[in-house]
Protein backbone atom coordinates (compact mmCIF):
# COMPACT_ATOMS: atom_id res chain seq x y z
CA UNK A 1 0.00 0.00 0.00
CA UNK A 2 2.88 2.38 0.72
CA UNK A 3 4.02 2.11 -2.91
CA UNK A 4 0.52 2.91 -4.14
CA UNK A 5 0.48 6.12 -2.12
CA UNK A 6 3.79 7.25 -3.60
CA UNK A 7 6.15 6.55 -0.71
CA UNK A 8 9.81 6.60 -1.73
CA UNK A 9 11.11 5.01 1.50
CA UNK A 10 9.23 2.27 3.31
CA UNK A 11 10.13 1.34 6.89
CA UNK A 12 9.15 -1.95 8.48
CA UNK A 13 9.23 -1.90 12.28
CA UNK A 14 7.83 -4.91 14.14
CA UNK A 15 5.16 -3.79 16.62
CA UNK A 16 6.59 -5.74 19.55
CA UNK A 17 8.30 -2.78 21.28
CA UNK A 18 11.71 -4.46 21.06
CA UNK A 19 13.16 -1.80 18.73
CA UNK A 20 13.41 1.94 19.26
CA UNK A 21 11.68 4.08 16.62
CA UNK A 22 14.31 6.78 17.27
CA UNK A 23 16.42 5.40 14.40
CA UNK A 24 13.79 5.95 11.71
CA UNK A 25 15.17 9.35 10.67
CA UNK A 26 18.75 8.05 10.45
CA UNK A 27 17.76 4.95 8.50
CA UNK A 28 15.63 6.97 6.08
CA UNK A 29 18.51 9.45 5.64
CA UNK A 30 20.82 6.66 4.50
CA UNK A 31 18.37 5.64 1.78
CA UNK A 32 17.29 9.16 0.81
CA UNK A 33 20.91 10.15 0.23
CA UNK A 34 21.66 7.15 -1.95
CA UNK A 35 24.10 5.44 0.40
CA UNK A 36 22.17 2.14 0.41
CA UNK A 37 18.80 1.20 -1.08
CA UNK A 38 18.03 -1.06 1.91
CA UNK A 39 19.00 -0.67 5.57
CA UNK A 40 18.61 -3.19 8.40
CA UNK A 41 18.88 -2.27 12.07
CA UNK A 42 21.14 -4.89 13.62
CA UNK A 43 20.91 -6.08 17.21
CA UNK A 44 24.27 -7.79 16.75
CA UNK A 45 26.51 -4.94 15.51
CA UNK A 46 26.56 -3.04 18.79
CA UNK A 47 26.69 -6.22 20.86
CA UNK A 48 23.43 -5.14 22.48
CA UNK A 49 21.33 -8.21 21.77
CA UNK A 50 22.30 -10.13 24.90
CA UNK A 51 22.59 -6.94 26.95
CA UNK A 52 19.03 -6.08 25.90
CA UNK A 53 17.81 -9.44 27.16
CA UNK A 54 17.80 -11.61 24.03
CA UNK A 55 17.43 -15.20 25.25
CA UNK A 56 20.62 -17.23 24.80
CA UNK A 57 18.93 -19.85 22.61
CA UNK A 58 17.64 -17.14 20.24
CA UNK A 59 21.07 -15.53 20.12
CA UNK A 60 22.75 -18.86 19.27
CA UNK A 61 20.12 -19.63 16.60
CA UNK A 62 20.56 -16.12 15.14
CA UNK A 63 24.33 -16.55 14.91
CA UNK A 64 24.02 -20.07 13.42
CA UNK A 65 21.49 -19.05 10.76
CA UNK A 66 23.39 -15.85 9.92
CA UNK A 67 26.65 -17.80 9.51
CA UNK A 68 25.08 -20.19 6.99
CA UNK A 69 23.20 -17.43 5.20
CA UNK A 70 26.36 -15.40 4.75
CA UNK A 71 28.01 -18.44 3.15
CA UNK A 72 25.08 -19.41 0.91
CA UNK A 73 24.20 -15.84 -0.09
CA UNK A 74 27.86 -14.79 -0.35
CA UNK A 75 27.28 -11.77 1.90
CA UNK A 76 28.54 -10.38 5.19
CA UNK A 77 25.54 -9.14 7.16
CA UNK A 78 25.74 -9.17 10.93
CA UNK A 79 22.20 -10.59 11.05
CA UNK A 80 19.25 -11.37 8.78
CA UNK A 81 16.55 -11.67 11.42
CA UNK A 82 15.85 -8.13 12.53
CA UNK A 83 12.34 -6.73 12.69
CA UNK A 84 13.55 -3.25 11.71
CA UNK A 85 14.24 -2.60 8.03
CA UNK A 86 13.88 0.14 5.45
CA UNK A 87 13.58 -0.13 1.69
CA UNK A 88 13.68 2.27 -1.22
CA UNK A 89 10.58 2.14 -3.39
CA UNK A 90 12.80 1.15 -6.32
CA UNK A 91 13.80 -2.07 -4.57
CA UNK A 92 10.23 -3.01 -3.66
CA UNK A 93 9.09 -2.40 -7.23
CA UNK A 94 11.79 -4.78 -8.48
CA UNK A 95 11.58 -7.77 -6.15
CA UNK A 96 8.80 -10.32 -6.47
CA UNK A 97 7.60 -10.21 -2.86
CA UNK A 98 4.12 -11.33 -3.97
CA UNK A 99 5.64 -14.81 -4.47
CA UNK A 100 6.86 -14.96 -0.87
CA UNK A 101 5.57 -16.94 2.08
CA UNK A 102 2.78 -15.57 4.26
CA UNK A 103 4.72 -16.35 7.44
CA UNK A 104 7.76 -15.12 9.37
CA UNK A 105 10.18 -16.26 6.64
CA UNK A 106 8.68 -13.58 4.31
CA UNK A 107 11.17 -10.99 5.62
CA UNK A 108 14.08 -13.34 5.02
CA UNK A 109 12.91 -14.11 1.51
CA UNK A 110 12.92 -10.37 0.81
CA UNK A 111 16.58 -10.07 1.80
CA UNK A 112 17.52 -12.97 -0.49
CA UNK A 113 15.55 -11.33 -3.32
CA UNK A 114 17.29 -8.01 -2.72
CA UNK A 115 20.70 -9.66 -3.02
CA UNK A 116 19.52 -11.65 -6.05
CA UNK A 117 18.76 -8.42 -7.89
CA UNK A 118 22.18 -6.98 -7.06
CA UNK A 119 21.25 -4.49 -4.37
CA UNK A 120 23.41 -3.86 -1.32
CA UNK A 121 22.11 -3.74 2.23
CA UNK A 122 23.48 -1.31 4.80
CA UNK A 123 23.29 -1.93 8.54
CA UNK A 124 23.06 0.30 11.59
CA UNK A 125 23.38 -0.80 15.18
CA UNK A 126 20.15 -0.87 17.15
CA UNK A 127 19.58 -1.45 20.85
CA UNK A 128 16.73 -3.81 21.69
CA UNK A 129 14.70 -4.75 24.72
CA UNK A 130 13.24 -8.15 25.49
CA UNK A 131 10.53 -8.30 28.13
CA UNK A 132 7.45 -10.34 28.98
CA UNK A 133 4.98 -8.12 27.09
CA UNK A 134 7.06 -8.12 23.91
CA UNK A 135 5.71 -10.59 21.41
CA UNK A 136 7.93 -13.42 20.34
CA UNK A 137 7.30 -16.51 18.29
CA UNK A 138 7.14 -19.80 20.15
CA UNK A 139 9.70 -22.59 19.87
CA UNK A 140 7.78 -24.58 17.24
CA UNK A 141 7.33 -21.57 14.95
CA UNK A 142 10.95 -20.58 15.56
CA UNK A 143 12.06 -24.00 14.30
CA UNK A 144 9.78 -23.67 11.27
CA UNK A 145 11.26 -20.21 10.62
CA UNK A 146 14.83 -21.53 10.93
CA UNK A 147 14.17 -24.34 8.45
CA UNK A 148 12.52 -21.82 6.11
CA UNK A 149 15.59 -19.58 6.31
CA UNK A 150 17.86 -22.48 5.40
CA UNK A 151 15.50 -23.45 2.54
CA UNK A 152 15.52 -19.90 1.10
CA UNK A 153 19.30 -19.67 1.38
CA UNK A 154 19.78 -23.04 -0.31
CA UNK A 155 17.32 -22.07 -3.06
CA UNK A 156 19.32 -18.89 -3.61
CA UNK A 157 22.60 -20.81 -3.95
CA UNK A 158 21.09 -23.45 -6.26
CA UNK A 159 19.50 -20.71 -8.39
CA UNK A 160 22.84 -18.89 -8.63
CA UNK A 161 24.37 -22.13 -9.88
CA UNK A 162 21.56 -22.40 -12.47
CA UNK A 163 20.16 -25.63 -11.03
CA UNK A 164 16.69 -24.30 -10.12
CA UNK A 165 14.57 -21.23 -10.95
CA UNK A 166 12.33 -20.42 -7.96
CA UNK A 167 9.55 -17.88 -8.51
CA UNK A 168 10.77 -15.66 -5.69
CA UNK A 169 13.88 -14.77 -7.68
CA UNK A 170 12.00 -13.77 -10.82
CA UNK A 171 11.42 -10.03 -11.37
CA UNK A 172 8.11 -8.59 -10.27
CA UNK A 173 5.86 -8.26 -13.29
CA UNK A 174 2.59 -7.13 -11.73
CA UNK A 175 3.63 -3.82 -10.17
CA UNK A 176 1.16 -1.05 -10.96
CA UNK A 177 1.96 2.52 -10.00
Task: Indicate where each model-derived feature is located.
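Hydrophobic helical membrane-anchoring modules
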Residues: 26, 74, 98-177
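Acceptor/aglycone-binding surface of glycosyltransferases and processive sugar-polymer synthases
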Residues: 1-5, 9, 21-104, 131-140, ...
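Acidic metal-phosphate-binding loop of nucleotide-sugar-dependent transferases
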Residues: 17-18
